[in-house]
From Swiss-Prot:
Keywords, in A-Z order: Cytoplasm, Methylation, Protein biosynthesis
UniProt protein name: Peptide chain release factor 1
Keyword RNA-binding: no
Gene3D superfamilies in the record: 3.30.160.20, 3.30.70.1660, 6.10.140.1950
Modification comment: Methylated by PrmC. Methylation increases the termination efficiency of RF1.
Family: Belongs to the prokaryotic/mitochondrial release factor family.
Predominant localisation class: cytoplasm
One Pfam family in the UniProt entry: RF-1
Gene Ontology CC annotations of this record: cytoplasm
UniProt cross-references to InterPro entries, sorted A to Z: PCRF, Pep_chain_release_fac_I, Pep_chain_release_fac_I_sf, Prokaryotic/Mito_RF, RF-1
Length: 362
């Protein structure tokens, strides 16, 4: 193992000890926000510290066994112990490499899911509805909660646009590779000739960020409009102007929330979405400025990048980033995304390991 990696692992162990002491401090315990933040950092380090401890113990066991090789009575046993511990070290080093992949601090957060109809008119809107239902079913299977913030329904079903908040354990980390253009090939219900049409929708996944600790927003930069919210066909029409639209004038970012009957609640939810959008834009700009914007194998998350095709006549789904084709489209559209998302995460992990090896000259 490289000396630089050993040094980093020792530093992480020191930090873990420091966090253990801090979490027992009465002042920290009384500060709920700080306590939660430090608890999460402590939890993230637990496995690394445990594996590194086992690695060092295996090295010590090899040293002890090597000192016994000169004794004929213990030579065979010592050789066997050396062999076993070398195999263990190889396995633990692989585990440590994976654990040392930089974690996205937003992975544990809730997320905003945005689905928009692209090319294809009514059929694109209908497919937006199908995608939203697919994600809703998956969220339900994970015990996550979905809260619709705004929706613009299509004339013949589905959505021109739907934006929701998905709350639960590790939502953003699980869904973040879904951003991009999703293409569908199928025969629309309105097609009398049986011809296959191609339509597209875009999906964006944004991590929810803490309103108090991120970008500062000058109230003077905001234009806040209220309007009367209404659903298709006159459903849940509000008789007061409770829907809220907030425009961040310097950037032109616009957010809306119309689902609550209370204008105050709609404004609070719209502000939370605005902060997440601005923070996401800021982070993307920083990454562009500080790196070569290397496009990972799994993709950049650019919503214009075509990432997936859903082919109904063939019953298949193809993810173009990792050349994965699954012939179980019906199950996928019912929310069975585990195999797909696991494959994307494995590919991303392999990509990150290759990057680390390159950076470490190996």
């Amino acid at each position: 193992m490289k000396e630089s990696l050993r040094l980093r692992l020792d530093q992480l162990c020191d930090r873990h000890e420091e966090l253990t002491a801090l979490l027992a401090d009465a002042e920290v315990i009384s500060d709920n926000k700080r306590f939660r933040k430090l608890s999460r950092e402590h939890s993230d380090l637990n496995e690394i510290v445990d594996v590194w401890s086992k690695y060092r113990q295996a090295e010590e066991d090899i040293e002890t066994a090597e000192s016994m090789l000169s004794d004929p009575d213990f030579k065979d046993m010592a050789q066997e112990e050396i062999k076993e511990n070398r195999a263990l070290i190889e396995q633990l080093e692989g585990d440590l490499n994976i654990l040392m992949i930089p974690k996205d601090p937003n992975d544990a957060n809730a997320a905003y899911l945005e689905v928009r109809a692209g090319t294809g008119g009514d059929e694109a809107a209908i497919f937006s509805g199908d995608l939203f239902r697919m994600y809703s079913k998956y969220a339900e299977s994970r015990g996550w909660r979905i809260e619709v913030l705004s929706e613009n329904e299509g004339e013949h079903g589905g959505y021109k646009e739907v934006i929701c908040r998905v709350d639960g354990d590790g939502v953003y980390g699980r869904l973040k590779f879904e951003s991009g253009a999703h293409r569908v090939q199928r025969v629309p219900a309105t097609e009398s000739q049986g011809r296959v049409h191609t339509s597209a929708c875009t999906v964006a996944i944004l991590p929810e960020v803490d309103v108090d600790t991120t970008v500062e927003i000058n109230p003077a930069d905001l234009r806040i409009d209220t309007y009367r919210a209404s659903g298709a066909g006159g459903q849940h029409i509000n008789k007061t102007d409770s829907a809220v639209r907030i425009t961040h004038v310097p950037t032109g970012v616009v957010v809306e929330c119309q689902e609550e009957r209370s204008q105050h609640k709609n404004k609070a939810k719209a502000m939370a979405l605005l902060v997440s959008r601005l923070e996401n834009a800021k982070r993307a700009a920083q990454e562009t400025a500080t790196s070569e914007m290397r496009r990972d194998l799994v993709g950049s998350g650019d919503r214009s990048e075509r990432i997936r095709t859903y082919n109904y006549p063939q019953g298949r789904m193809t993810d173009h980033r990792i050349n994965l084709t699954l012939y179980k489209l019906d199950a996928i559209m019912e929310g069975d995304l585990t195999e797909l998302l696991d494959s994307l995460h494995r590919e991303y992990q392999a990509d990150q390991l290759a990057m680390l090896a390159q950076e470490n000259g190996g």
